[in-house]
Amino acid sequence: MGGVSFSLNGKAVTVPENPATRLSDVLRGGFGLTGTKIGCNAGDCGACTVLLDDAPVCSCLLAVGQVDGQAVTSIEGLHQTGAIEKLQQSFLAHGAAQCGICTPGMLVSAAHLLHSNLQPSRAEVEDALSGVLCRCTGYSKIIDAVMQAHAVQPEPLMPDAGSNVGSAIQHLDGLPKVAAELAYGADKLPAEALMLRVIRSPHHYADFKIGDKSAFLAQHPGIVAVFDATDIPGRNAFGVIPPFADQPVFAETTARYRGEAVAAIVGVPAVIDGFDENDFPISWQPHVAMLTPDVASTPDARQMHQGRPENILIKGYVACGDADTALARAAHRVTVHSTTPFIEHAYIEPEAGYAVKQDNRLIIYGSTQAAQMDRDSIAEIMGMDVDSIRVMPSACGGGFGSKLDLSFQPFVALAAWKLDRPVAICYARGESMRSSTKRHPSDIRLEVGCDTEGRISGFVFDGVFNTGAYASWGPTVANRVPVHASGPYVTPDYRASSVAVHTNAPPAGAFRGFGVPQSAVAQECAYDLLAEKLGMDRLAFRQMNALQNNMPTVTGQCFETGVGIADCLEALQPAWDAAVARVEQFNKEAEKTGSVFRKGVGVASCWYGCGNTSLPNPSTMRMGLRADGVCVLHQGAMDIGQGANTVIAQIAADALGVPVHSLSLLDGDTDLTPDCGKTSASRQTFVSGKAALLAGRALRETILRHANVSDDASIIIEKQRLQLVDAATGNMANIDLSSLPVDDYGYVFMSEETYDPPTTPLDENGQGSPYAVYGYGAQMIELTVDRGLGQVRLDKMTTAHDVGRAINPLLVEGQIEGGVAQGIGLALMEDYLPGRTENLHDYLIPTIGDIPEFEHIIVEVADAEGPYGAKGLGEHVLIPTAPAIVNAIRQAVGVLITNLPATADKIRAALQAQGTGHD
C-alpha cells in the first residue's frame, strides 16, 4: 500500500511518486496530460492551471501529496466531457488563441468562472483570468470570448473559391490549441531520452577553467557525459548573420555574460534534475563587467572580440540633403534624449526539445522561428552536410524574435550524436531569461526643426544600442534604425547614425521591430514638442508632414503606390477630435473639483519596411495535387501564433481557385517544406504570401493547360477527379487523377515558386531601396494619470493600420492587440536587469487588467508588390504604442518621461520636481 490517491478527471488514481513531487510533473509525466503547460514553476504565469475540487490552482505550486483525497480536473478532463465546448467555440470564433501556450490555463480559469456566472462582466472576467499571463493576444479577444461564451456562436466561415482572401476565417490550426492537443517543445520528449543540463556562467565577465571531467563522472553515477568546447566537431560559433557569427556553443576560456554556456552534463532525468551545480568542477576568475556602452566603448576598455576596437560591432548611417543647414534656418527646433532598457521577450513557453540520431542523420525537434536557419547552423557546428540534419519544429509557444537564434538545439544535437541516444532538454524560466536574447537598450539623441508653417526642416539623429556580448541581430538593428528614424514623414534634410556596442550583458537580438520602437519614442515625442511650439494640433502636424506616393523617403526611394500613412492619420481624425474634446472637458472639471486625476490623449505614427534590409530575402512555396484528390501546401513559414498557416493558405487557395478548407497543410519540417525564410521582420504575409500566390497560380495554370480550358475556368476537386468548368463557354472537362503518373513528391500536378522582393544595396550615405514594401500605422491612446501616485490607467486605444489588403481581418486585429500590449510593457513597466529580474514576478509584463478598450480601423492601401496588395503587419503594431502613451502622459500632466519605462515613481518624481504633484 502507499502512494497518493485522488480523483483525476473523474477517475480514481493512485500514484507512487514522492508526495513532494509537483502536481504538474505528475500530470504531465505520470499521466501524459501535457495540456497542463509549464511556463515558470513559480505560479507566475498560470499556464499550469487546473481545478482542485472545482477551484483553479497553479499545479506547479502544489505537491501531489497536497491533493490526496481531492478531485483534480485538467484541461483534458474539461475537453473530453464537453464541459467547455461552447467556450472553446467562442475562443475560436474570436481568435482568442494565437500561439496557444496560455490557452489551457485561460480555458480552465474561464470554465470555473462560467460555472457559476454564465454572463460575466468585463471586470469579472479580468478578475477570474488575472492569474494567467499571455504574451501574444493582448487579452482583449480572450475577454470577448469568455463574455460571449454563453451565446450561440456563428458557424465558422467556409468561403468559396475566390473568396478566401478577405475572409475572417478562424485559425486553421486553432482546434488543437483550444483542445490542448497541440504539442510544444516539452510535450513529446522520448520516454527513453537522457536529459541535458547546461552549466552556465554565474558571472557577467570571467575567465574559467574546467577541472577533471573523468573524476567528476566517476563521482556522479547517473551522469553519463560532460561536454564542453573541446567536443565540438565542427565550428564552435553560430550567429544569424554569417559574417558576424561569433557566439560559441560553449565558451572556451572566457564567459562574456551571465548565463553563457560553458559546459553541459547529460544523464538520467532524476539525477540531472537533482544535480547541484556547485558540484561541477570549474574555477572562475571574474573581471570587472562592462554592462553599458559608455563603459565598454572607451579606448582603454577590454576588447571583447578581435577586430572590434572599442567594442563597436557595427555602425549604421543614412543621410540626405543638408541637415545642419536646414536646422540652422528652421523657425523652431527641439531636442529629445530618450533611453530604453533591455526588454525580455517573456514568451510563456521556455525553450525545450530533443535530438535523436537516426539512420546516420540528426533529427532535432523543438520550438523555433527559423527551421532552415537552425538546420544550416547545426550542420556547421557539427561539421556535417545539411542533408544530414532534419529540423522538425514543434508548436511554438511564442517567439517574438528570440527564437530566431539557436538556443537548446546545438546542445542536444551534440549529445545525441556523440552518445547515440535521444537527448532532451527543458529550460527553466530563469535559465531562459538569463540566456536568451533581449530587445536592444537604446540611448538616443535627436534634434529636429520645422518652418513657420510646420514642415520639417532638418533632422539629426544619433542612436547608441547595447548589443550585448555577441552580435546576434545587432547589425540588423544598427542598419534598420537610421532608415526608419524619421518616421513616415517628408524629411528632405536628414542625418541619422547608429552604433551597436558590445557589453557584458546578454546578447541583444531580434524583438518585434528591430530597434524601430526605440527610435520612435524620440521621434514622435519631438514632433509633439514642435507642434506645441507652433500652437498646432498634434495630429494636424503629422498630417502636414506625412509621406505621399511619389515622395522620396530618407533613402531616396519613391513608391508610386501603397504609401498609406496619410490614410491612417485621416482615419483617426474623428476619434481624435472627440477624444481631445473629452479630455479637455474632464480636466476642466478636475481642476474645479481638485481631483488628483488628469486625462490625456496621445498620438504616434509608424512605418516599417517588410523583410530584410537591402539583402536577399527569398521564400519558396510548393503545392501539389495527389492522385486521391488531396491538394497539399508545403508551407515552411513558421507559424508562431501570428497566423501564417492560415493567411498563407488563404492566399494560395485563391490563387489556385479552390476553397481554403480543401487544402492540406505541411508546415515547417525541413525534410518536407522548401525554405520560406525566417519568421521575422513582418515578412511572411508579404514574402511567403507572394511565393504562395505564385505557386498557386502556377499549379492552376498547369491544371488548366492539361485540360485545355480557358484561364478563367473553375476548378472543383471531387476525390480522385477534377471537374473544370469553362466560364466562357460553359464546357466541362474532367480529369481522372488516379490515371495520371506521379512525380518524386507523389503528386500528379505540382508547382514550386520562389519570390525575392526587389531591393537594392544602400550606398555610403544610406541611399537606395532597402525594402520593396513598407507598412504604415497610427495609434491614439486615451489615458488617466493619478497626480498623487504617478499611476497611469489606459482607457482606450484607437488604431489605424494600413495592411494593404486584410487577408484575414480577424487575425489582423489579433496582431494589433498583441503588439499594443507589448508596446504598453515597453512604455510603462518592462525593464530587464541581468541577475535581478530573471523571473515573471520581478520582471513585469502587462496582465489582463492593464489592457485598454480597443477600437480598430483597418486601412487598406494596396501595394502592387504584395500578394493581393497585402503588406506585413506584425512588427509595425507596437512601434507607435509607447510614444503615443508618453505623449498622452505629457498632455495629461505636463511631464515628458523619455527614460522608459515611465513608471509611477518616475512620473511622481517629475511632477514633484515641477511643483505639480498632488499629495
Give the label of every model feature segment.
Residues 614, 618-673, 687-688:
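Catalytic phosphate/nucleotide-handling subdomain of diverse soluble enzymes
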Residues 229-230, 383-388, 418-423, 452, ...:
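C-terminal catalytic domains of large/alpha subunits in multi-subunit enzymes
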Residues 50, 182, 186, 352-357, ...:
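Short beta-strand elements
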Residues 95, 167, 173-179, 309-353, ...:
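Glycine-rich loop/linker segments at domain edges
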Residues 1-160, 179:
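Signature of N-terminal electron-transfer/Fe-S-associated modules in redox systems
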Residues 301-382, 547-630, 839-857:
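Helix-loop-helix junctions that connect adjacent transmembrane helices in secondary transporters/permeases
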Residues 395-420, 424-425, 644-652:
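Thiamine diphosphate
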Residues 150-312:
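Flexible, low-hydrophobicity surface segments
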